[in-house]
């Protein structure tokens, strides 16, 4: 299982990548920009802040069916997610500092938030 699990390949939720250049735990550990390190950073950030715990309340600030971005507030944080391949704009006013990002982040313009393609950003208010 390339070092990610000790379980049988048949019992895993997702199949093991069969390619010769498939990522291994060892290769991911050595690459600070790897998916493994990214997941560890975001989990550490989440655990540092009570507002981001699983039982935290949230308020949707912007959401449209089949349209990005999705923007919501949890306590003192505003979180914006854009999984699309295009820059997405939400009519949301954000006054805070960027606390965490994955991807290209976002840009605050007057009364809107422009989120880069395939990006995730957290602002601390």
What do these predicted ranges mean?
Residues 1-88:
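Loop/helix patches that line or flank the sugar-binding groove of alpha-linked glycan CAZymes
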Residues 2, 102, 125:
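Active-site donor-binding loop signature of nucleotide-sugar glycosyltransferases
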Residues 7, 96-99, 125:
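Intrinsic disorder/low-complexity segments enriched in polar/small residues
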Residues 36, 70, 96, 113, ...:
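A broad, low-specificity signal marking well-ordered, structured residues that form hydrophobic/aromatic
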Residues 61-63, 73, 93-95, 103, ...:
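A structural detector for beta-sheet-dominated domains
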Residues 71, 106-108:
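Assembly/interface hotspot detector across virion components, adhesins/toxins, and nucleic-acid enzymes
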Residues 77, 86-104:
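Beta-strand-rich binding/interaction modules
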Residues 109-125:
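C-terminal beta-strand-rich structural cap/linker in extracellular carbohydrate-active enzymes
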């Amino acid at each position: 299982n390339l070092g990610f699990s000790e379980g049988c390949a048949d019992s895993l939720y997702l199949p093991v990548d069969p390619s010769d250049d498939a990522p291994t735990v060892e290769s991911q550990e050595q690459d600070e920009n790897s998916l493994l390190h990214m997941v560890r950073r975001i989990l550490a950030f989440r655990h540092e802040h009570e507002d981001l715990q699983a039982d935290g309340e949230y308020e949707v600030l912007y959401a449209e069916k089949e349209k990005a971005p999705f923007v919501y507030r949890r306590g003192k944080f505003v979180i914006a997610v854009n999984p699309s391949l295009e820059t997405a704009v939400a009519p949301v006013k954000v006054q805070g500092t960027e606390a965490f990002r994955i991807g290209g982040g976002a840009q605050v313009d007057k009364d809107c938030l422009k989120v880069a393609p395939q990006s995730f950003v957290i602002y601390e208010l």
